[in-house]
């Protein structure tokens, strides 16, 4: 059940289109999105995303016995102050990114939705503040990209490699990737209950809340959540106690250095929503996420504004109070004596070793195509699998 109908839990808003889609989502928070250098990097990130999902989309068509279409999966284009446009008739993202003045916010979303008010499995969104707002602490810039869950199995290593390449291309502050829920760009509120339904049904490893929400982009010196993959700049790595203080066993955690002291941590070989607690019991958090949360607890936000709003008519459960939001932020927190059991459970899960080569090969290719600087020296625990030094 990877999609839900529009307004499923909001009878007054129901439509016969898709209102929520369970996906694998990457989110990056960065600075200086008003500068030509970063705008150019954003274009490169989009071009690699588009090429990656186009190839996959066409391969699925061939596998289904269809003739490959000329278009990729993206169908709709949204930008600030304008009505949604059919993607093939919209201005290219490159044109928008390079023509939008630096003192004006760059806002764009491209989705694979079948209808302009719906959502789909593919989404690429950018919100980059204009110079005045960016230099007056009005929040971080945001890039979001998503793929269907099956993509990870059918294109091993590509998602992680693109996420890492984007971290190297942009002046990121932090980021995360894992399971999330795409909602319609123009109709978030009527479908937020569906997002929270997924998290309650499948488990705490599913992210909740708009990645571009005000309370999230305004976080200072903290991150909203751990996830399958977490990226931290050097300041946040230091605030967490330093890379050497992270007692994360390399058989289950990738630690990929980037930039000047930044670190990307991958928890487990694949994203997880939960682990089963048995019939009739609520799902338990994945051990790899619990232990990463414990390691990064000094920099994880304990308070935020509400993560969801819903509609005026909402009666379904939502994270629309500060109490519910704060409980969600601490959903991976366990008592110290319970953490010991999580280490034992972690050792029952697949190790990351055999998956790193595919990521490393794809990352090398992305770096070459995007013209990224030489990577920092290996620490022996990253995707390259090399020895330190």
Question: Model-derived features: where do they sit?
Answer:
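C-terminal interaction module
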Residues: 1-66, 185-389
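Internal, hydrophobic cores of structured domains that mediate oligomerization or house catalytic pockets
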Residues: 65-199
